[in-house]
Every structure is written in structure tokens, then in C-alpha cells.
Amino acid sequence: MYLNNKNIKLPEDPDTIVWKYLDLSKFLDLLMSKKLFMSRSDKFEDQYEGTFSEPTYEEIKRIAENNPEFLQYYKSHREKVAVSSWHINEYESFAMWQIFTQNSEGLAIQSTIGRLQNAVIPEKKYDQYIGEVNYIDYKKEHIPFE
């Protein structure tokens, strides 16, 4: 079961359509393992994806002046976060096909937020969240953290 978090927004309508774009090898892995592949957030191609904005990082550094372990915790946090990215849209997206499939070989899985919520099997070792990514200006905007 996924957990709720006040800082992680989720569309209210459980029938919100989501898409997962996969190349053939990732789809075959899904079929054989019966598990979704989760990417570590420190392995994303986009260097800003899954990181703190500059204003937030500066705040973390100030807090860490008297507690160096605090900064190290936040730096290592990306290695411990795994993500399965889905795209919210009523229709397929040509851009998503281009990004997530190789050599025009791949497929798209259509589901809904509600079906994903019901499909998440409780994990005892890890906290699980489902939420919508909020893209921001990483140079200017502050990201709340606890």
C-alpha cells in the first residue's frame, strides 16, 4: 500500500489516465518478473530530475553547518529513491514515444491512477508513494522538505 504525504500531490480522480512507455526489453522484463522496473533517482539522465532546487540546497547547507551528517543524508538520499515514471494524459504522446522507446520498438501501457493504487503491494522494507511530479525552475523555486 502506498503512503500519503502532504507534499506529494496526487490527482483526485482515480480514473485519471496514465501511460507507461517501454522499450521491448523492459516490457519482456515486466512480463517475466511480474514487477515494474524502478529506476534509482541518482541514475536519471536529467541531472535536475529528483534533486533539490538551488534555493532548497542552500537552505540544507545552512542547516548542515552544525550537523555535517544532515547534508550527507540528503546527498545520499537519491541513491535510495527508486521511481517508476508514468505520463498523465488522455491520449498517447509522441514525445514520450521518442524518449522512452528505442529504434521505434516499444509499447505503451495505459492504466489509471486508481488501478495503480490498487496494484501496489505493501512493501515492508520501504515507504511507497504515488504522486504527480511538479516541474519547477530549479534556479529560483524552493522545494519544501522535512
Description of each model-found segment:
Residues 1-146:
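Partner-binding and oligomerization surfaces adjacent to conserved cores of proteins
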